Amino acid sequence: MKKKITLIIVDFQKDFSNVIGKLSVKGADKARKAIIAFIKKNAEFIGEVIFTVDWHTANHCSFKSNGGIWPAHCVQYSEGAGVDDKILHLCIELGINMKFFIKGNDDSVEEYGAFEKMGTIMTIGNDHYSISANNHKNDCNITFESDKVVICGIAGDYCVKNTIANLIKYKSPTGLTLDVNVLLDGIASIDDGTTIKEYCKENSLPIVEAKEYKYLKG
């Protein structure tokens, strides 16, 4: 039996993914289409979708009004902080298990990478893993249940890259690591995509595309 995939969708929120968003990222529409195509093609093998979510207060240090470099975005409970409707509704329609991981809710911390505080990888049975992670503020805990990870989202040169870095640096005390695959056409970047491509190359990460992806052998 094949292992299920954990699909991690980083910060695909309306302030980033919509053209009228507070911090709209070019290429988000193309990335959305690729993610939707991937989910439809691999739905039976996707055990869960984890949405990471920027969840700032109006006082967050990253905002220009507070001395940061970004316009205010993804403010808690605002429309712009909402997860992209089309992807969310597809997961609901297909009955895919969804989890949401809040980050960036500590006003004093710029939290690009979602999983900086990962716990122990626990083996359950012969081929099943349970990995826990906390956010920086320790008020959100999540467990993802597969060592086969496909990651995509916004923005490739910031939150996606740093979240990948969190995942690939982790090794359990017994030497277990995660099988991280990058859904490149499901990523939108503030730059032209060079940063995420070079990062994947430097770290020998498998790059996949929605149109050609075939589920890895179990």
What is the role of each PLM region?
Residues K2-I8, Q13-S17, K30-F45, T57-G218:
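Active-site-adjacent betaalpha module
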